[in-house]
Amino acid sequence: MDPAGPDNDERFTYDYYRLRVVGLIVAAVL
């Protein structure tokens, strides 16, 4: 995995957004 990849930031943003969505769903259920 190359941290200097052109899509590194995009992938990180997608993962972070997905994590936030999962967190919101869990918070709503709890």
UniProtKB/Swiss-Prot annotation:
Signal peptide: none annotated. Its main location: membrane. One of its GO terms (cellular component) is chloride channel complex. GO terms for molecular function: chloride channel activity; ion channel regulator activity. The keyword rRNA-binding does not apply. One of its GO terms (biological process) is regulation of monoatomic ion transport. It holds the Pfam family ATP1G1_PLM_MAT8. Phosphorylated by protein kinase a (PK-A) and protein kinase C (PK-C). Phosphorylated in response to insulin and adrenergic stimulation. InterPro entries: FXYD_motif (IPR047297), Ion-transport_regulator_FXYD (IPR000272). It is a single-pass type I membrane protein. It is found in: Microsome membrane; Endoplasmic reticulum membrane. Keywords: Chloride, Chloride channel, Endoplasmic reticulum, Ion channel, Ion transport, Membrane, Microsome, Phosphoprotein, Transmembrane, Transport. Induces a hyperpolarization-activated chloride current when expressed in Xenopus oocytes. May have a functional role in muscle contraction. Belongs to the FXYD family. This is Phospholemman-like protein.
